[in-house]
Design a protein with these regions (language model features):
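Alpha/beta-hydrolase superfamily serine-hydrolase fold, recognizing
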Residues: 26-66, 71-74, 78-335
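Bacterial Sec-dependent N-terminal signal peptides
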Residues: 1-25
Length: 335
């Protein structure tokens, strides 16, 4: 029996029908329209030239000048207000545990979460809203990691940090009331890439949850690459700078460009949940990756928000996509 479950908010292209081997679900039109309304407002409020400025900062840092990149990192590292129903605790200097305050006798699932930011910026604070929302909605624990950032720390150093964090969580999960046999890895954008690469490198990962992940760190001019190359949350020139800063000339390594992993490697992954934004430069490469998992008969749940754009996990402004992601991921972690 094919274990692939595809959830698509609307039919975006004929290519997706090939994925629908075991059925589709369609949320109501109201949610689709709400996501579209929020995306329009989000993009209208985006500061003109922001991503070009970020690209220049990354390029300068690659040449040794970190002044502009450090300013961007500081501006994106503001601690958000979190619900009182969730406790936060640093269990190491670089890992913050988000857990529900209410007591429970059951062992909770645990998610290692890896923030986005093109491997060059981002932090625990970037993803804290999402981690706290997951902990509350899913009655689970979420451990967010500050992995080392490019371009100072290139592949494989950030990936090694993620692998070591998982091993640490595995050793200590029971101390926090978590189930050491149900530790999953997730992340958004660059963090989704790291989640997949770490899951390919480890044994014992329960599930893997990449959200609008970077699948290939080299340019392939697809329809989404052309249509959403500018003005949609992750411009092509910025993505190219991110890719070069992290890969450091090793972009075709399958632990860097996870879409190049062998069939054997992919079939050894744990069950996969992918969430994609339809208006995203990364959309086509993620869809191709999902189709490949489907052809291999791999356990896959693939959700597309066709009227959302990149960044809805870490940057406020697309609450419907954010909340729907919380609902989907929470359910997946507890299945």
């Amino acid at each position: 029996m094919n274990t692939t479950v595809i959830s698509i908010l609307t039919t975006i292209s004929i290519s997706f029908f090939a994925l629908n081997a075991s059925g589709q679900t369609y949320p109501g039109k109201a949610l689709q329209l709400q996501m579209q309304k929020e995306e329009t407002a989000f993009l209208a409020n985006m500061k003109p030239g922001l991503q070009h400025t970020q690209m220049l900062a990354v390029r300068d840092a690659m040449k040794g000048d970190y002044s502009a990149l450090d300013q961007i990192r500081q501006s994106r590292n503001q601690a958000p207000v979190l619900p009182e129903t969730v406790e936060t605790k640093y269990i190491t200097p670089d890992i913050c545990l988000f857990s529900p305050v209410n007591a429970t006798e059951r062992k909770r699932p645990l998610l290692l979460y890896l923030h986005g930011g093109g491997w060059c910026f981002g932090s625990i604070n970037s993803c804290a809203r999402f981690c706290a929302a997951l902990a509350e909605a899913g009655d689970c624990c979420v451990a967010a990691l500050n992995y080392r950032l490019a371009p100072k720390y290139t592949f494989p150093m950030p990936l090694n940090d993620c692998i070591e964090a998982f091993e640490y969580l595995k050793q200590h999960a029971e101390e926090w009331g978590c189930d050491s046999s149900r530790i999953s890895i997730g992340g958004d954008s660059a963090g989704g890439n790291l989640a997949l690469a770490a899951s390919m490198s480890l044994t014992g990962v329960h599930k893997v949850i990449p959200i609008y992940p970077v699948i290939k760190l080299f340019t392939e001019v697809t329809s989404s690459w052309k249509e959403y190359a500018q003005g949609y949350g992750d411009d092509a020139e910025l993505l190219a700078a991110f890719n070069e800063a992290y890969s450091s000339g090793d972009s075709h390594n399958p632990l860097v460009s996870v879409g190049l992993a062998s069939d054997e490697t992919l079939t050894e992954l744990p069950p996969v949940l992918i969430i994609s934004a339809g208006h995203d430069i990364l959309f086509d490469q993620t869809a191709e990756f999902a189709r490949r998992l489907q052809r291999l008969g791999h356990p896959l749940s693939y959700h597309v928000f066709p009227t959302a754009t990149h960044l809805f996990i870490t940057v406020p402004g697309q609450p419907a996509a954010f909340q729907e992601s919380v609902r989907i991921v929470s359910r997946f972690l507890n299945e």
